[in-house]
Amino acid sequence: FLQFKGYAQNIARLRFDDDFSYLKADSLKTTWKEKIKNVSLGSNFQWSLGGEWREQYQSYEHLNFGEVPSDFITDSPHQLMHRIMFHANVTYKNTFRLFAQFNNTARFLNPNPITSQLDENLLSIHQLFFDAHLKGNWLLRLGRQEYAWGQERFVATKEGPNTRHPFYGATLKYVSPRNKIDIFTSNPMKMNPGVFDDVRSSESLSGIYYMHTPSKSRF
């Protein structure tokens, strides 16, 4: 029998949850990609860079059951959905953190989309928030941020559309091995197709999300 074993860093669902602290020692950085994931700036600052790229081809037959505006060229379009996102993360003494993520989305081959505001956003600051670690397991997050809880039935990043959905607000977070609490108040961002033209919506979203992980010994 032949056996193969590989090791890789776990990739989180959301980019700001990625943890590359295991690369803090320079001797563990063997490739250029690892070198940009944890860079020391003196003894107190660390920063990292990253990104993601998605190209998605879609083809439809009788889009929206054929109920499309009269000026549409066809109700059976095809389109190429393009998305690139870059992010930078800076931390200070594991106490403060600044996270920024830029978004570029575009639609090709289809001049008549039904949801253009979700298909194209040429350049935007998708996320820009500041974290402050408080006493105990508490953390305060302020700024433009993504929300995704549980199975994402109620609040999600909306991964299906080409442009993901951020919020602008404040979140007080508590994290322990078995309990997670998010207390939040925010405004959804209204995405526009141009360059740096997204605005805060007048709608608001506030609430408390709690998740408990029971002990394995109970089962």
Locate the predicted segments by residue:
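N-terminal periplasmic/intermembrane-space "pro-region" immediately following the signal or transit peptide
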Residues: G6-S76
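Residues that define the transmembrane beta-barrel architecture of outer-membrane proteins
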Residues: F45, S76-H82, N121-H126, R164-Y168, ...
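Transmembrane beta-strands of outer-membrane beta-barrel proteins
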Residues: W47-E55, L98-A100, W138-L140, I181-I183, ...
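Residues on the lipid-exposed face of transmembrane beta-strands in outer-membrane beta-barrel proteins
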Residues: G51, I84-V90, Q127-A132, A170-Y174, ...
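Transmembrane beta-strands of outer-membrane beta-barrel pores
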Residues: W53-E61, N94, F102-F108, R144-A148, ...
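Surface-exposed loop and membrane-interface regions of Gram-negative outer-membrane beta-barrel proteins
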Residues: E61-H82, Y92-G136, E152-T157
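Signature for the C-terminal beta-barrel architecture of outer-membrane proteins
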Residues: G136-L140, K158-F219
